[in-house]
Amino acid sequence: MCSSDLRTESPHDVFDGGHAGTGLSIGQGLALARDVRGTDERVAVVVGDAALMSGLSLEALNDIGHRGTRLLIVLNDNEMSISPTVGAISTYLSRVKLSKSWRRSKGGYDRIIGSVPVIGPTLASLSKSFRRSVISFAQEPGRLFEDLGITYIGVLDGHDRPVMEEAFEAAFRMPGPVIVHVRTQKGRGYRPAEADPITFHGAALPKMEVGVATDSYGKAGSEVVAPAPKAANYTSFFAAELLEVAASDHRVVAITAGMPTGTGLDKFAAAYPERFYDVGIAEQHAVAAATGMAMGGGRPVVAIYSTFLQRAWDQIVHDVCQNDQPVLIGVDRAGLVGEDGTSHQGMFTLTAQRQIPRIIIASPKDEQELRALVRTALAQDHPFALHYPRDSVTGTAPRSPELLPIGAAEDRKSTRLNSSH
């Protein structure tokens, strides 16, 4: 079973995809196509709280609210993508959950204002915009969405099916866009996943009745408590070498787009919190901000999966390379990544980057060369893309990392296996 939506796998999957933040735009397009046809289908989009803060989602919300499109948006708020969500929008949603009582007491505000001696009746008759500015001090839940022209319902228990059905039916009866804000728990229903949602985000699916996991080929394993620890991989060596360099070079800063654990930068964050930046699911912003940091004298390192780096193509070309800034782009999970599904392959980034002037591109043959390339990249005054796979490392004997010459290749003879075809 594919790890993300796949139309050939299920009639309930209407779109092939696995990248966060695209749903609102796709849903808007489906709803607009429905309106052009003059039909009456119901269009609903489920978007996570982490995906909501991506640039594409905000662009879509702007258009949806402007056009008043009849569309149901379900905001699935579990405070996580793979790692916990970050940023001002995440803080806003948390504040909304803390002020649930607002809607229950909202009707009392006009009565309170109207009862003020002498000037009460005048206050009660003021314009809607002025009254909104007064009562905004109470932190009205969903005010952000309401101001964009999207009706807000929430916060509701996303695990309460009758409540969900009632809310959805009410939302579908409304004429314009509606957002239903639901609170959920990641991994709900499977205790190990509830206890460790980050690890279980990409774990093999367990057989729930016996608690046994299978590997990619369907071979049953032992009873699952947590996924087995993985062997050391290129990501861990990249992160470890970055930590070593950062200890002596205070210009080095690390940036991730919502994936500190997946890119190994969680260790950098623990060691140097003042030099670590998780910008959320916002790859374009991550790369553009890195350009600014480099222009300001820093040595920024942006670690992003190859598949997600595609989203920041213009920033690599226009911001980093056109300005010839010393940004190190750690292209994690480069190449074929079979178990990550069709939407998460890393085979396109290398071909695309080879067309760009001024960027240096390298890929290590083993973990020791990776360590050397990290240091080599940070010693350059030009953009540097370091591609490395998801794979486990080769077990090459440790050696002191040295700066490598740019443009030189190593000719390694390989023994060909006998083949009968």
Feature names for model-found ranges:
Residues D13-D16, T39-S54, L71-V74, V252-I255, ...:
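A short, small-residue-rich loop immediately preceding and capping a beta-strand
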Residues Q139, E166-E169, H201, V210, ...:
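Glycine-/acidic-rich phosphate or pyrophosphate-binding loops and their flanking alpha/beta elements
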Residues C2-S3, L417-H421:
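Short, small-residue-biased leader/transition segments that mark boundaries at the very start
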Residues H66-S83, S101-R104, Y277, C321-R333, ...:
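A glycine-rich helix N-cap at a beta->alpha junction
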Residues L52-L61, I82-A88, L93-S94, E165-A167, ...:
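Short acidic, glycine/serine/threonine-rich loops at helix termini
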Residues M1-R67, V252, T256-A257, L265-D266:
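Cofactor-binding active-site loop characterized by glycine-rich and histidine/acidic residues
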Residues N78-F237:
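Long, well-ordered, tryptophan-enriched scaffold segments
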Residues L6-L24, V47-G48, L156-G158, A231-A232, ...:
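Active-site nucleophile and cofactor-binding loops and adjacent substrate-binding regions
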